[in-house]
């Protein structure tokens, strides 16, 4: 299979802990060893938010804040490249075209953000669309997609599976609720819907769940193309 794995920055390296990065690299290496084509997109996490908060206090524009966040995602991506044993791209790709070219060469493409205004959630969905991926995995800090933000609404229920149109509706509702956080952003959800991508949103704090998802084990929430 052709697989795109999106790893949240706070999941990959919450405290820049080498062991965590290595565990995620091992998960990707195992997919490659099983014959899959793999690319990884890495987020910025708490480190990016700390830089952004400081820069905002210093008067940076929203564009500059986005650019700063992208820089951090690429640093995290470079950490992952360093940990990979498989034939990873020598340095993080800075565009979808570069990542696609890397995959065509048989490399593991690794990238962070691309342009201001696009989260790494969206970057991963766009890459999956571009390379016609068989599966898009979001390794997040939550165990799937819920009917509402479970941190804000204790009655929120997790979906085992849902169609992409329902994902768009759920994410749209969560993003318009003050203080709530969605497991993937709305642009990513819309790209998933328009492309008919199959996606799985899972708790990536245990990296082995990535391989479990590829093997078809019931982990997280499966997003299916609209009927």
Curated annotation (Swiss-Prot):
InterPro entries documented for this protein: AceGlu_kinase-like_sf, Asp/Glu/Uridylate_kinase, Uridylate_kinase, Uridylate_kinase_arch/spir
Record's keyword terms, sorted: ATP-binding, Cytoplasm, Kinase, Nucleotide-binding, Pyrimidine biosynthesis, Transferase
Activity regulation (UniProt): Inhibited by UTP.
EC number: 2.7.4.22
Pfam families reported for this sequence: AA_kinase
Domain of life (superkingdom): Archaea
Residues holding ATP: 9-10, 45, 49, 140, 146, 149
Main localisation: cytoplasm
GO CC aspect terms: cytoplasm
Biological role stated in the UniProt entry: Catalyzes the reversible phosphorylation of UMP to UDP.
Family according to the record: Belongs to the UMP kinase family.
Name this polypeptide is given: Uridylate kinase
Organism from which the protein derives: Natronomonas pharaonis (strain ATCC 35678 / DSM 2160 / CIP 103997 / JCM 8858 / NBRC 14720 / NCIMB 2260 / Gabara) (Halobacterium pharaonis)
Gene: pyrH
